[in-house]
A protein has these predicted regions:
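Amphipathic, hydrophobic secondary-structure cores in small proteins
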Residues: 31-40
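Residue-level signal for pocket-adjacent positions within structured domains
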Residues: 8, 28-31, 61, 66
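Short, conserved charged micro-motifs
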Residues: 13-16, 50-56
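Short glycine-/aliphatic-rich beta-strand segments at the starts of folded cytosolic domains
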Residues: 1-11, 40-44
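Positively charged, small/polar-rich N-terminal and surface patches that mediate targeting and assembly
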Residues: 2-4, 27, 71
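Short amphipathic alpha-helix segments
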Residues: 12-28
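C-terminal structural segments of small proteins and small subunits
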Residues: 52-80
Length: 80
């Protein structure tokens, strides 16, 4: 069973990489760009036939290692 974890910075927190990128995009002539934010996507393949248990396991991975709960939010979706 495959799951995609999308991790993003929580709203209201500074995103220096996003700010630097938006400045560069403006310098390149993309003046209409209003917001850029960076995150990450992780795909995890779990050898399980129990979807609920696999989802719980992926959620635990996020809480313990993959995401920083102070600065980031995450969502998990089954993709296969």
């Amino acid at each position: 069973m495959k799951f995609r974890i999308t991790i993003e910075r929580k709203p209201g927190l500074a995103d220096p990489e996003g700010k630097a990128t938006i400045r560069s995009l403006h310098d390149l002539g993309y003046a209409d760009v209003q917001h850029v934010s960076f995150g990450k996507a992780i795909v995890v393949d779990i050898d399980s036939t129990d979807e609920a248990a696999a989802l719980d396991e992926v959620d635990a991975m996020c809480q313990r290692l993959l995401a920083n709960p102070v600065m980031e939010s995450y969502r998990i979706e089954r993709i296969g």
